[in-house]
Amino acid sequence: MIARGAYNVRMKRGFRIGMVFPGLLLLAACEGESNKKTPQTPQQMYEYAKALLKPNVEGDASDFAGALQWTRKAAEENWLPAVMDMGALYMYGGKGVQQNVETARSWYNKAVEMGSKEAHWFLGILDYESAHDIESALNHWRIAAEAGIADAQYRLGRLLSQKADSMKEGMQWLEKAARIGQKGGVPQACTALANLYMTGANGAPKDAAKAVQLYKAASGGGDPLAQLVYAELLLAGADGVPQDTEKGMSMLRLAAGQDYPRAIARLINILRNGPDAEQHEKEAAAWENRLNRLMEKQKK
């Protein structure tokens, strides 16, 4: 089974895990009256599916079943965006669509045959998560990475950097995925690089100052793990980072606010065992309740 959100999948057409056609929903808002005609071409079918997702002026609900039907027709007629959406729907399931890894794989294979490099990224996820075929996943991710897809560059870099003989290449891919100083980067790639520079794992060059800068960049990009690590550095005044308790606690709350269990647990510990613990008990209890709800949710 594919874990929802396991690799921060950011589908470029706006599709989100566990939801049906939200990318289409966004585009549907721009549709006019043309959707009243019966679609003939694959593109028209896809546009019609978008229109069905847009509630009409009378306030009727979106027609997800109809949208799925027309998206499938467009996909069967080789309209690539529809093919990719069908793969995503079966990859994660939802809105009446039963998750089916093999059906998702067949749609993505079709997309690959049509020339999609992005489809290789998703096939890599299927191979890694479901089939546990690391070699095949690496091959798919390499194709997508070479095409400039940042998520694939990140996953490829992460795997390669776990072994000493491929660590150097792994770091190169992570640097590409991080897009440091540019838009479109993967914050988790900055964090992965920072961990390597901080620990020197697998023969990586140790450079604490560079690691700190990468943690800071990844924190600004919203990665909760980086926010937790950077918060600890600020609280302790370690590795050349000036001690700043206020900023450290603020950073820790940012990580906890993303429902990152480790950050929530650390925040609770500080609130209950630090100065003025009695004054912070109400906040600590609120975070504890939040953590308990998260743990219960993960059990389901």
Give residue spans per PLM region:
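C-terminal motif of bacterial Sec signal peptides marking the signal peptidase cleavage site
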Residues: 27-29
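Short helix-capping/linker turns of helical repeat alpha-solenoids
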Residues: 40, 45, 55-57, 77-79, ...
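Hydrophobic face of amphipathic alpha-helices that form TPR/SEL1-like repeat modules
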Residues: 50-56, 85-93, 122-130, 155-163, ...
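Structural signature of tandem alpha-helical TPR/SEL1-like repeats
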Residues: 60-69, 97-107, 130-140, 164-176, ...
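Bacterial signal peptide processing site
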Residues: 31-33
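Bacterial N-terminal signal peptides that target proteins for export
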Residues: 5-19
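Terminal, low-structured helical/coil segments at or just beyond the last alpha-helical repeat
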Residues: 265-300
